[in-house]
A protein has these predicted regions:
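C-terminal end-helix/capping segment
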Residues: 124-145
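Non-transmembrane alpha-helical segments in soluble domains
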Residues: 16, 20, 40-43, 84, ...
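Hydrophobic/aromatic-lined pockets within catalytic cores
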Residues: 20-24, 58, 114, 118, ...
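Conserved residues at the C-terminal ends of beta-strands
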Residues: 4, 107, 148
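GST-like fold's C-terminal all-alpha helical module
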Residues: 46-131
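Long amphipathic alpha-helical segments
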Residues: 93, 145-149
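GST-like domain detector, emphasizing the conserved glutathione-binding G-site
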Residues: 1-70
């Protein structure tokens, strides 16, 4: 992203934090305290799901089949599962907290799982997280930005 004064910003998390500084509403990045660390924790869990999902997608889609690594794919699936389990354990807090970058990151990650790996049915093992996401996905900002294949 290039800012109004010509500076280049790289990486989604930096761009999101920059954009968050440009408005007067409630911050997506809480300034301090437990709520900040909670938001950043959820952001990292969501980003971790996305990172592992993209690595898995690249392996499945773009590498020649004879070069596929079952161990590599299994490692990415385990990474995703650990993050989903952690979020399942915290979903009651997530659902009661004001909107932060963590909510957005988790929502985007779960949407990506639906888009690219719907056959895995992440919801089956994470019913509370699935219920939270069903509500969160109805937000106008989420519903209008659902990726199309």
């Amino acid at each position: 992203m290039i800012t109004g004064d010509g500076k280049t910003l790289l990486d989604s998390s930096v761009i999101c934090e920059y954009l968050d500084c440009l408005h007067d509403g409630p911050p997506l990045y809480p300034p301090a305290g437990d709520v900040r660390w909670q938001a950043l924790r959820w952001q990292v869990l969501g980003d971790g799901i996305l990172d592992a999902s993209v690595l898995r997608r690249v392996e499945d889609k773009f590498r020649e089949e004879h070069l596929h690594s079952a161990d590599w794919i299994a490692r990415q699936k385990k990474t995703i599962e650990r993050a989903l389990s952690a979020l399942e354990g915290e979903v009651s807090v997530i659902g009661q907290s004001p909107l932060t970058i963590g909510h957005i990151s988790v929502g985007c990650a779960l949407g990506y799982l639906d888009l690219r790996f719907s056959q895995d049915d992440w919801r089956a093992g994470h019913p509370a997280l699935a219920a939270w996401y069903a509500d969160f996905a109805q937000r106008r900002s989420m519903a209008t930005t659902v990726p199309k294949d």
